[in-house]
Amino acid sequence: MEKLVIVGAGVAGVNAATKLVDNGYPGELITIIDMGKDPYNRKPAEVMEGFLGAGGWSDGKLTYHTAIGGHMSKYCGEEKAMELFDEVITNFKRFHPKPEEVQCSDPQAEPDFIKPYFGLRLFPVWHVGTDYLHEIGKNWYDYLVSKGVHFHWENKVNAINFRHGEITMRSVKPEFANMDDDYVLYDRLIFAVGKSGIDFGKKLSEQYTFPTEPKPVQIGVRFEAPQHHFQKLIDISYDFKLYRKFDNGVSLRSFCTNNNAAYVAVEQTYGDVSYNGHAKKGEQYRNDMTNFGILMEIPGIENPFDWSRELVQKVNKTWIADQGIKGRNAPKIHSGLYYSPSRKVGVTSEGEMIDALPIDSLDPVREAFQGYYSYIDDFIEDMKKVFPTLGDDWGVYVPEVKYLSPEPLVDYDNLTLAEWDEVHFVGDALSARGITVSGAQGIYVAESVLGSWKKHSYLLEQGTGDIF
């Protein structure tokens, strides 16, 4: 029997494991390794690692269109991609404590009032609700454990030997800092790291020199303002995506829009801070705010991953919080920046001040963005024309970033590497940028694994089976 290891317990890896055990694959042959914690021990602030990854700790919105969130249809066609999306959405409903509250918004018509300045991408979105993601995670995790799936939590994979099917990992727990590495052997590997593992995927790409496709830089800000300024558009498209493209190939889009009970969230990746957003379901969380990312896609930059990391480091600062404590004991905060013509830094859904250093001028941000911030300036100015009450009643948290390393070229039938047919890449490791696409890629790979496993089992029954 084949030992399968999944590196990354995010949406892609978890959906893959679920598809496998649902169809009889022995759970005791599946091992999942993740830097984070199980859903019972994962804290709200741990948004990047842990069961269901960043996607399962986000805004709880599942986009339902093949043109959004990364590649799926290019591998399997439109019809199959939508079938896989349905399966991802079904899984979230299946483990949801109140599945009847999962609803779909499906805007149909682009309003005339935005057309002079923006395009509006219209597509269906399933709303799971941030409030329920934790319970979904617990239910889903319990199911996989009940099927025999083994998890290695708080372990970081630092090397993979494709030739010998060997994974090297080490505990990230401080009390085990001096312990030796652990090793796990596999017959088949699903590499399903999230954003916090993109640097490791890049390292593997360079080590094994597998062919890749360059990806553009994706970086910008998290924009926040009172919801009433955008209500006219929200009534048409709840999760609106404004879009602009320029002649030099640079494009901008708003994305991950949160309304009603909308909060800016802090993400920590590679020791630096960036921002995202999420929305709560409960009326007790209502703050009548809207936030969304304004993200630039910049093609043609050499080493886009390194370029993005350097920019993020430039707009991260360590500063002393004004909490009445002086001297060496004064608390220090490492964060990104916050700029607003009129507003103060917001609070989290837990009522705590968002970690962001207020600045009086965007000049240091413009310098760090090396001239590209002018596109965001223009985007905001045009929003003020489309939404005339907006004026100076807004703020931006800097930066928001989607780390993308060069995308490995894979076999379209099973997402395996060209020279390593037992190694599959899925999720952020394959440039997925959304929950639905990540989950769909995981299920797609699982279907391939199941096909091989069932064929192998049949051959064994006939007395002719040997290896996959």
Question: What would you call each of these model-derived segments?
Answer:
Residues 2-66, 106-468:
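Residues forming the flavin
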Residues 50-103:
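Dinucleotide-binding Rossmann-like beta1-alpha1 core, especially the glycine-rich loop
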